[in-house]
């Protein structure tokens, strides 16, 4: 299967750090859920910006549907019809006085009829669980609400690829659930999702593929295989997800996928521990609280 979006030998950086990314290769298939992992400053946001057409690389190429993107104004406008990026800080993407105006900004710039713009706004807000915010002023929203509205603005463009920089950061558990539910529905509808995150457990549970940014390059593969690479995980300053750590500690052939499976996996070891403890407790003198004759005199 050919990649919908790809980086080939990509080099990117800034004047004070010219090679944040050095000879990066990445291929993202249509409909993929890809989690982008890495330490702070590793280059995750830089890579997203290059793929979105917001930052021109100094070397290599970004391709969409097998063709290099055109970095001219017209070419970038066309690219952004297909690839949208949501920044980590929602305030960097909220410009209008109220929510509906803000979400409608992108579709209006596509030259759509007002009825179509309205339909897209309602659809995107509903998908993000934010339809009740449509008439609210953006400055009145909580951080989590602003994050959902900023995401709705990108969703309203109906892109082929939606890229999100730390979409669950700063959200409460309900907000995380709502965001994940929205992303799942988007992928079910065929949207390709690329999520930069520090949440390794989320990446393991949610993603079809993982790409780890480490030492200015990218390692891409299946989540379980890549996150089981102890050396790569350590060099990337990541934590081993608890399901993989538990599977390794117990010698399991498959990682537990949820808490119930983890408890079931632990049951034999806990049973053996309890039996050993009970046996030891039944031996005279084995209880530390037992007093000797000398102590009781």
Swiss-Prot record:
Function, as annotated: Probably part of an ABC transporter complex. Responsible for energy coupling to the transport system.
UniProt-recorded name of the protein: Putative ABC transporter ATP-binding protein in cobA 5'region
GO MF term (any one): ATPase-coupled transmembrane transporter activity
InterPro entries cross-referenced by the UniProt entry: AAA+_ATPase (IPR003593), ABC_transporter-like_ATP-bd (IPR003439), ABC_transpr_CbiO/EcfA_su (IPR015856), Co_trans_ATP-bd (IPR005876), ECF_ABC_transporter_ATP-bd (IPR050095), P-loop_NTPase (IPR027417)
Domain (ABC transporter) ranges: 5-240
Cellular component terms per the entry's GO annotation: ATP-binding cassette (ABC) transporter complex
Lineage top rank: taxon: Bacteria
Membrane topology: Peripheral membrane protein
Principal subcellular localisation of the protein: membrane
UniProt similarity note: Belongs to the ABC transporter superfamily.
Organism, scientific name: Propionibacterium freudenreichii subsp. shermanii
Keyword list, A-Z: ATP-binding, Cell membrane, Membrane, Nucleotide-binding, Translocase, Transport
């Amino acid at each position: 299967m050919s990649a919908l979006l790809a980086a080939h030998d990509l080099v990117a950086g800034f004047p004070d750090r010219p090679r944040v990314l050095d000879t990066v290769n990445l291929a993202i298939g249509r409909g993929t859920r890809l989690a982008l992992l890495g330490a702070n400053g590793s280059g995750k946001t830089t890579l997203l910006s290059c793929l979105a057409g917001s930052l021109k690389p100094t070397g290599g190429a970004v391709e969409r549907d097998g063709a290099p993107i055109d970095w001219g104004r017209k070419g970038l406008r066309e690219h952004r019809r297909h690839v949208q990026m949501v920044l980590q800080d929602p305030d960097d993407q909220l410009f209008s006085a109220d929510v509906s105006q803000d979400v409608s900004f992108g579709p209006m710039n596509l030259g759509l009829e007002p009825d179509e713009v309205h339909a897209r706004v309602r659809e995107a807000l509903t998908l993000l669980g934010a339809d009740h915010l449509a008439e609210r002023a953006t400055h009145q929203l909580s951080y989590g609400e602003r994050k959902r509205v900023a995401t709705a603005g990108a969703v309203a463009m109906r892109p082929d690829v939606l890229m999100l920089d730390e979409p669950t950061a700063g959200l409460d558990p309900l907000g995380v659930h709502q965001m994940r539910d929205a992303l799942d529905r988007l992928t079910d509808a065929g949207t390709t999702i690329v999520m930069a995150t520090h949440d390794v457990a989320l990446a393991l549970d949610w993603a079809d593929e993982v790409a780890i940014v480490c030492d200015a390059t990218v390692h891409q593969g299946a989540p379980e295989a890549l996150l089981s690479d102890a050396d790569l995980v350590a060099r990337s300053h990541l934590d081993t997800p608890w399901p993989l750590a538990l599977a390794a500690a117990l010698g399991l052939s498959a990682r537990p996928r949820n808490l119930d499976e983890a408890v079931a996996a632990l049951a034999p070891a806990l049973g053996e521990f309890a039996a050993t403890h009970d046996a030891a407790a039944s031996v005279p003198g084995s209880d530390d609280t037992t007093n000797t004759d000398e102590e009781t005199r």
